[in-house]
Amino acid sequence: KIEDALNELKSKLKLDKVDRIELFDNSNLFGSFNVSGMVVFIMGKPSKNDYRKFKITNDKNDDYGTMREVIYRRYFRVLKDNLEKPDLIIVDGGVDLVHDGLVRYM
């Protein structure tokens, strides 16, 4: 079933492969204590050793700024340390948040 789901995802998104998927979500407590998390799936299964929590340096309640910071920090490190790049990045948020967070750095 996992393989079927991955094949459907590949087909719908017109991707060659989806072996590594990285997903991001932001959170805060009453507009403070901003944090963002990244979960990773490899071949459709959680890769908990690759999960990351990002403490946000900006203390404003700003989802766009938070996502920009996290995407920059994550993929700067991927490029700098020659880490495995994801086949698919999923961001929890609207189209504007995805555009603002990803398109600027990719």
Question: Language-model segments: what does each one mean?
Answer:
Residues 1-106:
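Acidic, glycine-enriched active-site microenvironments
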